UniProtKB/Swiss-Prot annotation:
It comes from Methanosarcina mazei (strain ATCC BAA-159 / DSM 3647 / Goe1 / Go1 / JCM 11833 / OCM 88). Gene3D superfamilies: Dihydrodipicolinate Reductase, domain 2, NAD(P)-binding Rossmann-like Domain. It is found in: Cytoplasm. GO terms for biological process: glycolytic process; lysine biosynthetic process via diaminopimelate. This is Glyceraldehyde-3-phosphate dehydrogenase.
Length: 335
């Protein structure tokens, strides 16, 4: 089998996870990753055997740090069939001309606007729409988590409306520059938040409104979800629908917080204590007439990683069936 050649531009929080997940597949391989500075992540990438690429202007800094380079970022892009752009939000747009010049396919993350790629992706919701595409945006962690629960409910019961309050982690565990440390911040204060329109980039017919706030934690996001459906249902019906989704995990056995979820991931031996699944508390599923409520936690560092692998597979036309790709990705990474 000829493997798809994948480059990761930006070996940071998402990029390093995507690289490892791609490398675990049998139909794609990493041909290079990029860093702009010779920090510890660059050193670890080299230690793990990844070919490392950097801007030509920074090659001297890498040489001084004793971290060998395989070439420039432009040279990495030229070698790839597809580039996963994991650079910080807003920077990816500036890279688009480089990808177009090289004639390679590109995936951006949810920090970029939908218009950049013209197609926003969630594996369960619209896999087939990404088949053969040159440009795709994998939606953000929060949007991914919401698509995963809205789509199967809509398919079986029909969704009339969705209302979500998102308690967002302030920043990632390794980020010492952001906050808050001792505050709760409505973000944005002017409602609704951007998450509803982002859901519509994948599921345009869904009536959804969202409100978000930042809280002083780094572990996970927490969603309070309210859905109104078109069909009579029970909590058991909702439980059954969620149970059919391989990327939804029910929290039980005394797990009552995001801290315990992360500890569970550690105890399971997950790499970087990643929890790729939506984490739903089944006891929170409460039905009143045709409305129901529940809590779910979202691990922002990892939830988009399997989605990105599926996006690669669709764009490279390695698998035409979304369900089969999801199964293949899950098995390879240990989900």
């Amino acid at each position: 089998m000829v493997k798809a050649k994948i480059a990761v531009n930006g070996y940071g929080t998402i990029g390093k996870r995507v690289a490892d997940a791609v490398q675990a597949q049998d139909d794609m391989e990493i041909i290079g990753v990029s860093k702009t500075k010779p920090n510890y992540e660059a050193a670890v990438a080299h230690q793990k055997g990844y070919d490392l690429f950097a801007p030509a202007s920074n090659s001297g800094a890498f040489e001084k740090a004793g971290i060998p380079l395989a070439g420039t970022i432009e040279e990495m892009v030229e070698k790839a069939d597809l580039v996963v752009d994991c650079t910080p939000g807003g920077i990816g747009e500036a890279n688009k001309p480089m990808y177009e010049k090289a004639g390679v396919k590109a995936i951006w993350q949810g920090g970029e606007d939908h218009e950049l790629a013209g197609f926003s992706f969630n594996a369960a919701s619209n896999y087939e729409g990404a088949l053969g595409r040159d440009l795709v945006r994998v939606v953000s962690c929060n949007t991914t988590g919401l698509c995963r629960v809205i789509y199967p409910i809509d398919r079986e019961l029909g969704v009339k409306k969705v209302r979500v309050t998102l308690a967002r982690r302030a920043t990632d565990p390794n980020d010492i520059k952001k906050g808050p440390i001792n505050a709760i911040v409505p973000d944005p204060i002017k409602l609704p938040s951007h998450h509803g329109p982002d859901i519509k980039s994948v599921l345009p017919h869904i009536n959804i409104t969202t409100a978000a706030l930042k809280i002083p934690t780094t572990l996970m996001h927490l969603h309070t979800v309210n859905m109104e459906v078109n069909t009579d249902c029970t909590a058991e019906d909702i439980n059954r629908i969620f149970s059919s989704q391989s990327r939804i995990r029910f929290m039980s056995q005394g797990i009552n917080s995001t801290a315990e979820i992360i500890e569970l991931a550690r105890d399971m031996g997950r790499p970087r204590n990643d929890m790729w699944e939506n984490c739903i508390w089944p006891e929170s599923i409460t039905v009143h007439e045709r409305e129901f409520y529940f809590f779910q936690a979202i691990h922002q560092e990892s939830i988009v990683v399997p989605e990105t692998v599926d996006a690669i597979r669709a764009m490279m036309e390695l698998e035409s069936d979304g369900a089969k790709s999801i199964q293949k990705t899950n098995k390879a990474i240990g989900l």
